[in-house]
Amino acid sequence: MLDFCVIGTGISGSTIAKLLNQKFSVNVYDKAKGIGGRSSFKRLNGKIGFDHGLQYLSPRSLKFKRFTKELTRKKILKFWGGNHKFLNKSVKKKNKHIKLIGVNGNNDISKYQLKNIKCYHQYELSKINRLNKVWNLQFQNGQVIKSKNLIVSIPFPQCKKLLSKFVRTSLFKNKVIMNSSLTVLLMTNKTSNNYSSYFTNDKILGWVSNENSKKRFTYNKDLWAVSYTHLRAHETT
């Protein structure tokens, strides 16, 4: 029987799994096809692809700075340079703001953390039971897993739905609404545009990333990740 079952392969889930794996048996499960959670990388062909979730990291706390510094030293992360166009008039620009990205994709952190751990994809947790101090986990694909301990690293609404029967916390009384963050993955003919990103001042269009500027690949087309949020779109209607 497993010592620990971790649900979610994002940065939090993968970091916890790596630490636990030093002393315990650990398996990780995720409903998606690949690793990364909110930092997923959409592969087009070979190394060519898009960061369609997390666009970059900009560490603030001392601990996270140490964490990213070590990953940069190990060439898991790198600095995203270039000309980043700051157009937003409601946010103050920080001159010391840095942008860190994965060397091959922004799911590189999770891949690195989970490289020696068994990961199961397309496993969406649908039901939880606890019997004789053992967690019985039922997935939508029909599989049932038993584990001594359970760690859930998934969005709040999903967590509340699955765990409110077993976990007593005032946090579940909070009314949390998660709005969609929509991203268009766009391919265009090669242009002379030399900007790495745009932080716009538009009510709908929030962010544009030039994926080619991340220097992970060379390609005869330009790749763009264009993002906006449900809230911004709703405000205009």
Pin down the residues of each PLM region.
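N-terminal Rossmann-like FAD-binding beta1-loop-alpha1 element of flavoenzymes
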Residues: 4-28
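Short beta-strand to alpha-helix junction loop
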Residues: 56-59, 91-112
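Central helical "cap/lid" subdomain
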Residues: 36, 149-195
